[in-house]
Swiss-Prot record:
Protein name from the UniProt record: ATP synthase subunit b, chloroplastic
Transmembrane segments: 27-49
Role according to the record: F(1)F(0) ATP synthase produces ATP from ADP in the presence of a proton or sodium gradient. F-type ATPases consist of two structural domains, F(1) containing the extramembraneous catalytic core and F(0) containing the membrane proton channel, linked together by a central stalk and a peripheral stalk. During catalysis, ATP synthesis in the catalytic domain of F(1) is coupled via a rotary mechanism of the central stalk subunits to proton translocation.
Family affiliation: Belongs to the ATPase B chain family.
Keywords: ATP synthesis, CF(0), Chloroplast, Hydrogen ion transport, Ion transport, Membrane, Plastid, Thylakoid, Transmembrane, Transmembrane helix, Transport
Record flagged with keyword Ion transport: yes
Gene name for this UniProt entry: atpF
UniProt membrane topology term: Single-pass membrane protein
Length: 184
């Protein structure tokens, strides 16, 4: 028991920690623990790092291969464009040799066809305008007819009472009977 008491008493004599911080003294930080941690990181990290580098290498090689293919396609298109340019230049030389009469003829044909197209468009426009005007007129007529019909029905409903209504029905039935006798 005396040893336990002595140990608690000795705790009171320990100097208190002055501050909390990082120990930058390599010799005071356990070099064995650091070497074990570094060894584990190198051992297990080597495979992951080599896989990452291999993947990156493959992507770079694919990118280079794609660039080479695109370069080849661009060179091929450039050659085709140059061939077309040579062909167009030869045709231009032929036009110059033959003179500008062909160009003038084409110009007149283009002007004539354009004027015909404009004329047709004008005719289509006029037909469309006439159609829309007729459509608007028909709509107005229909609305006027509907309003007149509603007005007439309103007038009839306000003027008709039951007795007048029965007399009108009787007169119409009588006219219908007379028409039926005439047709027989």
């Amino acid at each position: 028991m005396k040893n336990v008491t002595d140990s608690f008493i000795s705790l009171g004599y320990w100097p208190s920690a002055e501050s909390f911080g990082f120990n930058t003294d390599i010799l005071a930080t356990n070099p064995i623990n650091l070497s074990v941690v570094l060894g584990v990181l190198i051992f297990f990290g080597k495979g992951v790092l080599s896989d990452l580098l291999d993947n990156r290498k493959q992507r770079i090689l694919k990118t280079i291969q794609n660039s080479e293919e695109l370069r080849g396609g661009a060179i091929e298109q450039l050659e085709k464009a140059r061939a077309r340019l040579r062909k167009v230049e030869m045709e231009a030389d032929q036009f110059r040799v033959n003179g500008y009469s062909e160009i003038e003829r084409e110009k007149l044909n283009l002007i004539n066809s354009t004027s015909k197209s404009l004329e047709q468009l004008e005719n289509y426009k006029n037909e469309t305008i006439r159609f829309e005007q007729q459509k608007a007129i028909n709509q107005v007529r229909q609305q006027v007819f509907q309003q007149a019909l509603q007005g007439a029905l309103g007038t009839l409903n306000s003027c008709l009472d039951n007795e007048l209504h029965l007399r009108t029905i009787s007169a119409n039935i009588g006219m219908f009977g007379t028409m039926k006798e005439i047709t027989n």
